[in-house]
Each structure stands twice: as structure tokens, then as C-alpha cells.
UniProtKB/Swiss-Prot annotation:
Gene3D superfamilies: MFS general substrate transporter like domains. Probable anion transporter. It comes from Oryza sativa subsp. japonica (Rice). This is Probable anion transporter 2, chloroplastic. It is a multi-pass membrane protein. One of its GO terms (cellular component) is chloroplast membrane.
Amino acid sequence: MASIRSCVSVNPAAAVTPVKYKSARVGAAGLDPKGLRISCSSSSSSLAAGGGDGCRDAGCASSSGRGSGVVGSVGDGWWGRRGGQRERAVAAMCSAGMEGVRHGAAAVASVPAASASALPERAKVVALVAAVMLLCNADRVVMSVAVVPFAAQYGWSSSFLGIVQSSFLWGYVFSSMVGGALADRYGGKKVMAGAAALWSLATFLTPWAASQSTIMLLAIRALFGLAEGVAFPTMSTFLPKWFPTHERATAVGISMGGFHLGNVISFLATPIIMSHIGLAGTFAFFASLGYLWLSVWLFNVESDPLDSRTISKSELQLILAGRSASKIQGSKFPSLREILSKIEMWAIIVANVVNNWGYFVLLSWMPVYFKTVYNVNLKQAAWFSAIPWAVMALSGYVAGASADFLIKSGFSVALVRKIMQSIGFIGPGVSLLCLRFAQTPSVAAVLMTIALSLSSFSQAGYFCNVQDIAPKYAGSLHGLTNGIGTVAAIVSTIGTGYFVQWLGSFQAFLTLTAVLYFSATVFYNTYATGDLIFD
């Protein structure tokens, strides 16, 4: 690898005072082009602004590997005056790999501190992302609960219930593929806002559509899935812009914790709300929560921290220093043929397929499993089904925090992703095999809880791995893999029913799912990488 040498010189100001900037991006960087000189020995190009030899003044530091530099530019908002004195502050970071970047950030020259709130801006961001993911899943579960009174009111057959439930995935499988590309192009803020507005509208219209015709109901449910399919790839694009590499798994864990918590809240709250305000009122209530979130999101979040007017300079520098090397200006999105030619990409695809396969088997059939195998009533089945999802919401955060701790401790990104993914697949596989020995619903609930809790470690495995190998195209590639995974979810959900009908038992299909978990673990550990593949 080429050696990269960075030289920084600083012309100190007579006095350092806060500065107001016309450009949010420039102001956040807080850099003065005059007096800055950066040169890299691995490149024939150099950046120089103003006089003075930076190398003589500041000395040089070198390292090896892939390097990246972060320097403020453009705009005339560089200057501030107080008492006739001019301040100059220069910050330059040039490194080779993530550790080099972080060390470079620690050596940044003094930058005037902007007033900032006590709560980091990225904490607000991840809280809002977790909130919208909670609503995303909660709105799905509303229909799963409401479908029972709907069926009683309109005389739906069991087969039609299956069609209604699957109609959500018809739109989902399409938008999950294109949603990431939209987020990459237009920014996560706009795309997530549009998606939440649309799925909240579809939620509100569902009772009305059911009263009109079956075609109208299926169309509204497909529209609902179309809007929700954007959420995951948009999150995959949005979070890497706001969090350095060593914090991303934690951010994903918190966001996914919100997603799984939405399952629990809606499962338990929907029957209560429905008993007070009816079917239409329940859907309207959850839709209103979406628009309430939207009003907060639009005025408090930007797609990129460089566009934020409230972020502190120190936090911005931390984020920029911890970003993966960005793509060369002017490079094009890789073709589908190029994407599918990379075995590292197939490792992520296979992991996504198997994860979705197992996830939707448990999501769709767990209440039926408890009722059929252990002959419990529907209320008991709902509680036994809710417990695993509640624990999963917490375990996802533990998985993310553990992964980030290992990366900060010096373990390679590839090794950490493989460890997390192994836990996320081997744990559920063993738990599903043990279900054949469960004699009581309580023991089965414990095994289901273990399976789902450990499966959440996949969030710090293959899910974050997309951001490692293609940070610039994370949304698009996650959309592609998630779209393929959604097809697997449709197959597994329908396949479970046929297996139970033919064999009279859930265990055969659960055993097949366990075998897929184990096989995917071997494939992922063999071919996955933490290196940049698409830049």
C-alpha cells in the first residue's frame, strides 16, 4: 500500500472567538484556507492555500494503507472579527485506515468552539430513527391483530386472510430494492419522511378500503408495503453518514431495538385501543403517531451532518474522522453484473435470505404454533409470542454495543462481523432444534426467546457489513439484498403452512430452517470481508 504523509501548518490568531458562518457545511468545518498546506507523498497532487511551508512549521506524520482527508472548503464564512482582530483556525486530517483517521482527528489544531447542546446531535438522530422504526413495525402488527374482527365482520375465509396478510409483501419486495437508490440520490431525510407519510396514510385508509371492496383493500395494503419497504435501506444509508465506523453497530442496534419494540407495543396495545375506539379509530390513532413523528423529523434532522446548523464542530470532526473512505468524485454506481460477481456480496445476500426466512417463519407462525402444539388460548398465545420480541429489542442493542467495543479494542471489522453473524445464526439454529424436546409452552417460549434474541446479533453482522464494503452505496445494496430476502420470506411463510398441512407438524420445517442457519454461517464466515469493495 502506498505511504501517505500529511503536513499541517497553523497560523494562530491573536484571539480566538466564536464565528458565525453563512454556509452550514463551511461553518461546521471551521477551517481557514489561508495558511494551510497538505501534501501526500502517495499522490502527485497537493493542496496548498496561502503562504508558509506547512511541513517546516508542523512536521509530518506518515502511515500506510488507504487514506482519506477531511478539509473544509468553499464559502466566505471563514472569518470572524472581534475588537479588530482576525482569527484563523485550521483543521486538517489525513490518515491511512480508520485508526489513522481517529489519531489524525486527535491532533487537530485548535478550532473555535461553537455553542452546542449537551445532547450530541447524533443521539437525537438515532432516537428519531428508532422511533420511526418502532412505528414501522407497530403499523404492521395492527393489521395482524385487526384481521380477526375484520374477518368476522366481512366473512373472510382463512385462505383470503392469507392473501390479505401477504399483500403487504407485494409492494414491499419492490420498494425495498429501489428505496435504497432513492435514499442514496435524494438523501435519507426526504425519503424516510415521504415513506412515513405514505404508510401512515395507508394505515388510516385501511378500514375504509375494507368496507369498499377486496380489491381496494389489497391495493391499500400493497401501497402500505410499498412505503414501508423503503425504511430499512434508507436507514442503512442514513446512519453511516451520522456515525463513525466504531459507533455504527450500536446505532443500528438502537434503531432495530425500536423496530422490535414496535412489535411488542402494538401486539399488546392494539386490542386495548380497539376496545375503546373501535377498528377505524385504532388505525387512525397509529396513523396520527406517524404524522406526529414526521413533524419532529422534518425540523430537527438533516441527511448529512455537514448540513446541520446545530451540530458542534467537535462532534462533526468526530463523525468525519470516523467515516470510511468515500468514493472518488465522478465514479459511477456499479452495474448489477459487477455487484453479483463479488463473492463478498453473495455472503451478505445469503445471510439476508436466511435471516429473513427464519424471521418471518417465527413472526407469522409463532401464535399459531403455541395454539396448535400446546393448545393454549389466543390470549395466552399472544403473550407467549410477545415475550421473545421484547427481549429481542434489548439484545439488538447489546449486539451493537459489543461489536463496536470489539472494533475499538483493535479487532478487525471482518472478524467482528463474522463473530456477530455466527452468534446470530448458530444460536437460533440450536434453539429451533431443541424445540422438539419442549414439553410445556413455557419451555418453548424460553427457546423462542433465545432464538430471536441471538438472531438480533445479525444486525451487527451482515446488516452492518453492507456499510463496510460499500459505504457510498449502502442504501442501494441493502435494498437489493433485502428485496431478495423478502422473496425468501414469502416462500418460508407459505412453505410453513404446506409443511404443517402435509406432515401435521411444525418440527420438520423448523429443522429445515435450522439447517439453513448452519449452512449460511459457514458460507458467510468463508467469504465475508470488512474491506472496501465498491468505492
